[in-house]
Amino acid sequence: MKLTMGLLLGSVAMFASAGIHAADLPVKAKAVEYVKICSLYGAGFYYIPGTDTCIKLGGYLRVSLALGTNGVYGAPDSGVAGARNRIRNYYTSQSRGDLNIDTRTATEYGMLRTYFEAVNTWSTGGYTGAGTSAINGSTAYTTSIASQISAGSLGVYYAFFQFAGFTIGKAQSQFASPWTNYPGNNFDGLPGGGGWEPVNQFTYTAELGQGISAAFSAQDQVANLTSNIWNVSGATAAGLATGAYGANDIGGSRAPDVVAMVRVAQAWGLFQASVAAHENHAAYYGADETTGHPSDKWGWAGQLALSIKNIPTGAGDTINMSIAYTNGASRYNFQEYISSTVAMYGGTGVPGAYQSVGLAGLSDSVFVTGSGQQLTTTYGFQGAYTHNWSPQWNSAIYGGWGAVRYNNTAKSYICGAVVTTLALSSGLAGCNPDYNYSAVGLITRWTPVNNLTFSADVTYVMLDQKYTSGSTVTLPLQSSVAKPGAAYELKDQNALTLLLRAQRNW
């Protein structure tokens, strides 16, 4: 018994000792890969663990409230906003969240970069008229509780990569200045230069030293760089009442826009010269291909941009300005956030007229059945002066002006439709579809802490139409904007809007 007990206790002690020794043996720990700061490309970059690629995450959250317009943030110059009646919005709100991802890798060919930016946006809905007659009219909200998601949208702003001097993907147009249509403003609808909206492109940029660069680009014209190609033979009373001077007769994409740009960016500021070639490719005269079509015509655009930094009025003060001229490529001056058809209503003093209206239409070209395209000319300028009152406060005064000019042949086409269809009281002698469009404004920004900014932007928009003063047209019933069929005076119009915004960048 004693022998058995001794053997049992000895066995337990042996196994216990073996367990203790095994636990005490050193074990090689798995290496921990800490995220390391990447200082090669500036603040905010980190190495992706296990790679030589640096990544930076960024974005912003923005909340806006626009007064006097149905858009955030454009002019009330068309649709229900231009109608200025009880259907329009007196305020429009919007919330937006933005995320951008920037990756960079050093290679033997230079830096390899990818950039992606997307936003989710939620905006106030609007009302449109849905009546079928002037007596039995009704109004319907564009979104209901069950379909409120229709007021939200996902947008892909940028998606491109850069390698060995090439930029491929959706990026800023090489034609546009660095500030695009925002020389100092938040207001979207400023004429006088190329716009912000990115485009798909294939671009080569040569860095020539001392801040001088040159770029050559082929870019998609479909989404943002074509306005209207009107077949005036298809003009209707309903279309003319909105500023559409014909049936929009754009054919499929045939050739990309070709852009060249030279830029000098140095400590004093920036100078840029840009040119673009734009093909106008119309569809058919009639309902099928047997009706024929006008020949293609190439248009072109040019822009000069200048930025002057650190002017004597204060540290950080800047002046940004640009001028543009186009022929058959109108979106390079009247950028994509400006309405291509304008119908703004107001009061009148003309006896027998129900109200006044300002009508205007933007195109790249116009034609009638059996004829060739007549290219539309535009020119304009924009600019802003920004003054820093303190590190927390700054203000900018800004403005833009653009002119649309139709040649005599195009005017004869358009005026034939306006006089015949809308019964223009002054006849052909009083008909002129040319117009000027301008906006001036003042914005003040307050940045109480880094990357948080509150701003107030007030803008005055003016339409200077060229029809003879006192002329009237007879417009049909327009249920969508609740306007009755009646005589309207053709008259210059204006509008005042205000944008309040809070934005936190990160």
Please state what every model-predicted region is.
Residues 4, 18, 492-506:
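Outer-membrane beta-barrel "beta-signal"
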Residues 1-74:
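N-terminal periplasmic/intermembrane-space "pro-region" immediately following the signal or transit peptide
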Residues 267-440:
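Detector for outer-membrane/organellar transmembrane beta-barrel domains
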Residues 470-501:
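C-terminal beta-signal and terminal closure region of outer-membrane beta-barrel proteins
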Residues 35, 66-93:
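Surface-exposed strand-loop-strand hairpins of Gram-negative outer-membrane beta-barrel proteins
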Residues 70-77, 126-138, 144-145, 151, ...:
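Outer-membrane beta-barrel translocator domains and adjoining extracellular loop/strand segments
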Residues 44-67, 86-237, 252-270, 308-310, ...:
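Outer membrane beta-barrel
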Residues 40, 92-98, 156-158, 197-199, ...:
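Transmembrane beta-barrel architecture of outer-membrane proteins
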